[in-house]
């Protein structure tokens, strides 16, 4: 039977000094016989998805204490990708994921903590904490801050839903008046919470339900809704229960690595493909799997993408449905239910409640569940009021969306496509693979041939788009923006949003060794591996080359002869120490980013650090 990890600092005469310090934090003699449970919060006033988390950490702590544990809270950093977007701040976003994982490890191991509750929400925080949970493998419950309500604006007597991407797109649309820009800017992000579409944050928080480390509703109950309070209360109680199961009863069932198995990762990826989620989830699942010693690779993503149907189109792939509508249609378990009906899931995975997938579906499917208290959760609706207060409203939908033919969630026979919302492409331009969110690609662009226009930074590409240097049929290449080459693998939301504002998004492609925001749509292909800085072929593309993209056949090809390719490789290597670096880019790279670039791998490995 394992001893409390915390006994290292709370038991024995040699730990008198440590106990003295624990007492100075408010602990009593009785507390030294209880589990010490960390509340790993990510509250910050910089991020709307985290602005409301300060009091939520205290709420979880209250229920840990009342359930028999000792609660100790600490914070991680949290970067807002939307605010960091479009300038050098985006270089820090992806590296912050690994920094968060490290900081959690440092705090947990330095203080010999027994278990933890992770309060996350936005893009890199959930995956960073997941990496830490699988690395540490101590009892853990995840609970996120919840999604933002969608923005609303009335134009020509018609209410239109908005999100962050609308504000970005409108801001550079030459047809937008100053008044329109101001109105959309004020309306796009009305409440606390993670941005209202199926962007990276909400995708990851939904995937945590499928992996099994969070509670039902984690990814979809609005941050403002009173129903979300129950998740934090339950998390505080549950973590004490599963902690005691491990330390008192020697039950390892609920340890993160026993919950987040390869089958659970496959179910999570299937969910992401079916709901047309962010491509960043591929990066994060690969990284988390590595931390948990789970054999989940790009090959698994590729195989799943060929058989999992695309059952949802949510913002940014449509203007009609946001997370609040997805929740009304049954949320995560609504999609999993449809996949399960056609035997596309591993059914014996289980979650921190101790229930396997089929048991969860029987309780949480709005089509078959008969527990009125559970089904009531899915009636949780937006209030339409601007606020940064959690649990501040209790609005309900009059009915649920159970239309599986034309509704927010489709059944298999009504799917938008039968081969999924995310695809892995291979070819001479991406020997180790690349990712495209097919849910955001217009049908006419599934097969595309265009002429390359090459840029060696996101800034250079943005300048070209806004100054009318891009024409229909172009394939914009943005290289040396990968994990090593950036460094930091910037998101490319601005280039894709600007293409949209210039009405070129249906007539151009964008290819990069960087990545895309969950808010990206259009023919946007990222995660090119190997990246340019790792001697990837993308480094050899020249303006005027033709690029062939064939999504149905999962191919991406630079159309030059083998002899020409070999000549370009030779010419690049002849540059000596400057080979496979940008030829003219000026960028300040700090020591922190240089250290990251020394160890980071390409995207097909999850952009994790290679330190083994």
UniProtKB/Swiss-Prot annotation:
Mg(2+) binds at residues 81, 123-124, 491. It catalyses: (2R)-2,3-dihydroxy-3-methylbutanoate = 3-methyl-2-oxobutanoate + H2O; (2R,3R)-2,3-dihydroxy-3-methylpentanoate = (S)-3-methyl-2-oxopentanoate + H2O. Binds 1 [2Fe-2S] cluster per subunit. This cluster acts as a Lewis acid cofactor. InterPro entries: Dihydro-acid_dehy_C, DihydroxyA_deHydtase, DiOHA_6PGluconate_deHydtase_CS, ILV_EDD_C, ILV_EDD_N, IlvD/EDD_N. The active site is at residue 517. Its cofactor is [2Fe-2S] cluster; Mg(2+). Coiled coil: none annotated. GO terms for cellular component: cytosol. It holds the Pfam family ILVD_EDD_N. SUPFAM superfamilies: IlvD/EDD N-terminal domain-like (SSF143975), LeuD/IlvD-like (SSF52016). One of its GO terms (biological process) is isoleucine biosynthetic process. Its EC number is 4.2.1.9. Keywords: 2Fe-2S, Amino-acid biosynthesis, Branched-chain amino acid biosynthesis, Iron, Iron-sulfur, Lyase, Magnesium, Metal-binding. It comes from the Bacteria. GO terms for molecular function: 2 iron, 2 sulfur cluster binding; dihydroxy-acid dehydratase activity; magnesium ion binding. [2Fe-2S] cluster binds at residues 122, 195. The modification N6-carboxylysine is found at residue 124. Pathway: Amino-acid biosynthesis; L-isoleucine biosynthesis; L-isoleucine from 2-oxobutanoate: step 3/4; Amino-acid biosynthesis; L-valine biosynthesis; L-valine from pyruvate: step 3/4. It is an enzyme of class 4 (lyase). Homodimer. PANTHER family: D-XYLONATE DEHYDRATASE, D-XYLONATE DEHYDRATASE YAGF-RELATED. Belongs to the IlvD/Edd family. HAMAP family: IlvD. Functions in the biosynthesis of branched-chain amino acids. Catalyzes the dehydration of (2R,3R)-2,3-dihydroxy-3-methylpentanoate (2,3-dihydroxy-3-methylvalerate) into 2-oxo-3-methylpentanoate (2-oxo-3-methylvalerate) and of (2R)-2,3-dihydroxy-3-methylbutanoate (2,3-dihydroxyisovalerate) into 2-oxo-3-methylbutanoate (2-oxoisovalerate), the penultimate precursor to L-isoleucine and L-valine, respectively. This is Dihydroxy-acid dehydratase. It comes from Buchnera aphidicola subsp. Baizongia pistaciae (strain Bp).
């Amino acid at each position: 039977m394992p001893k409390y990890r915390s006994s290292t600092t709370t038991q024995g005469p040699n730990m008198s000094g440590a106990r003295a310090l624990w007492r100075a934090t408010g602990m009593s003699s009785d507390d030294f016989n209880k589990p010490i449970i960390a509340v790993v919060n990510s509250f910050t006033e910089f991020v709307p998805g985290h602005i409301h988390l300060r009091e939520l950490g205290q709420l979880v702590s209250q229920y840990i204490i009342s359930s028999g544990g000792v609660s100790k809270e600490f914070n991680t950093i949290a970067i807002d990708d939307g605010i960091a977007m479009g300038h050098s701040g985006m270089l820090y976003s992806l590296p912050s994921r690994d920094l968060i994982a490290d900081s959690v490890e440092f705090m947990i191991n330095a203080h010999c903590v027994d278990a933890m509750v992770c309060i996350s929400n936005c893009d890199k925080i959930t995956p960073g904490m997941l990496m830490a949970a699988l690395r540490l493998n101590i009892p853990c419950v995840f609970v996120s801050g919840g999604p933002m309500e969608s923005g609303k604006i009335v134009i020509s007597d018609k209410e239109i839903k908005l999100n962050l991407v609308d504000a970005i797109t409108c801001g550079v649309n030459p047809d937008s008046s100053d008044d329109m820009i101001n109105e959309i800017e004020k309306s796009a992000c009305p409440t606390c919470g993670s941005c209202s579409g199926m962007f990276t944050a909400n995708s990851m928080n939904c995937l945590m339900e499928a992996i099994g480390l969070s509670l039902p509703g984690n990814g979809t109950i609005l941050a403002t809704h009173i129903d979300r309070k129950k998740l934090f209360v339950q998390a505080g109680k549950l973590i004490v229960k599963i902690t005691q199961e491990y330390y008192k009863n020697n039950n390892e069932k609920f340890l993160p690595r026993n919950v987040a198995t390869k089958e659970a990762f496959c179910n999570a990826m299937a969910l992401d493909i079916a709901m047309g989620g962010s491509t960043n989830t591929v990066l994060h699942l690969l990284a988390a799997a590595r931390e948990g010693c789970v054999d989940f690779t790009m090959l698994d993503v590729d195989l799943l993408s060929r058989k999992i149907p695309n059952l949802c189109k949510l913002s940014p792939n449509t203007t009609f449905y946001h997370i609040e509508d997805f929740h009304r249609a049954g949320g995560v378990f609504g999609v999993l239910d449809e996949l399960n009906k056609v035997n596309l899931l591993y059914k014996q995975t289980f979650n921190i409640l101790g229930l396997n997938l089929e048991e969860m579906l029987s309780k949480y499917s709005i089509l078959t569940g008969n527990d009125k208290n559970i089904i009531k959760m899915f009636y949780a609706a937006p209030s339409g009021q601007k606020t940064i207060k959690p649990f501040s409203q209790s609005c309900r939908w009059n009915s649920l969306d159970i239309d599986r033919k034309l509704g927010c969630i489709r059944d298999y026979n009504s799917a938008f496509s039968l081969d999924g919302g995310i695809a892995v492409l291979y070819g001479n331009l991406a020997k180790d693979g690349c990712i495209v969110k097919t849910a955001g690609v217009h049908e006419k662009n599934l097969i595309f041939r265009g002429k390359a226009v090459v840029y060696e930074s996101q800034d250079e590409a943005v300048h070209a788009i806004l100054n009318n240097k891009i024409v229909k049929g172009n394939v914009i290449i943005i290289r040396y923006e990968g994990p090593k080459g950036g460094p930091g693998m910037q998101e490319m939301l601005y280039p894709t949003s600007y293409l949209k504002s210039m009405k070129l998004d249906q007539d151009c492609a964008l290819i990069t060794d960087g990545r895309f925001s969950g808010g990206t749509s259009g023919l946007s292909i990222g995660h090119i591996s190997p990246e340019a800085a790792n001697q990837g072929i993308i480094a050899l593309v020249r303006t005027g080359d033709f690029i062939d993209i064939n999504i149905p056949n999962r191919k991406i090809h630079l159309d030059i002869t083998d002899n020409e390719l070999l000549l370009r490789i030779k010419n690049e290597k002849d540059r000596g120490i400057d080979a496979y670096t940008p030829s003219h880019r000026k960028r300040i790279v700090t020591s922190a980013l240089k250290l990251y670039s020394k160890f980071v791998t390409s995207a097909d490995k999850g952009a994790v650090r290679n330190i083994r």
